[in-house]
Amino acid sequence: MEKLTILLLVAAVLMSIQAVNQEKHQRAKMNLLSKRKPPAERWWRWGGCMAWFGLCSKDSECCSNSCDVTRCELMPFPPDW
C-alpha cells in the first residue's frame, strides 16, 4: 500500500511539472507570434515609411510625406486645394 501511495505521489508531481512546462512553452510561443507584424502591415511598410493609405499620425511617417489625419495620401496636395 505504501508503494502505491508513493507511486501516485510521484506520478502527480511529474504530471504537474509537465503541465507547468507546457504552459511556459505555450506562453513563449504566443510571445513570439505577437511580436511578428501582420502580413498587411509588412506589405504597407517600405523602408521605414508607410505607403499609400497606411495608418499615420504625422507627415514624416508616410513615404509621400503627406498624412491626412489618419491615413497616408498618395501624394501631397497643393495647399490651395
Swiss-Prot record:
First and last residue of the signal peptide: 1-19
Keywords, sorted A to Z: Disulfide bond, Ion channel impairing toxin, Knottin, Secreted, Signal, Toxin
Disulfide bonds: 49-63, 56-67, 62-72
Keyword Transmembrane helix: no
Tissue-level expression: Expressed by the venom duct.
Subcellular location, principal: secreted
Residue ranges listed under propeptide: 20-44
Domain of life: Eukaryota
Matches recorded under InterPro entries: Conotoxin
MF-aspect GO terms: ion channel inhibitor activity; toxin activity
GO cellular component: extracellular region
Subcellular localization: Secreted
Function according to Swiss-Prot or TrEMBL: Inhibits voltage-gated ion channels.
Family stated for the protein in its record: Belongs to the conotoxin O2 superfamily.
Domain notes: The presence of a 'disulfide through disulfide knot' structurally defines this protein as a knottin.
Name assigned to this protein: Conotoxin Vc6.7
Organism: Conus victoriae
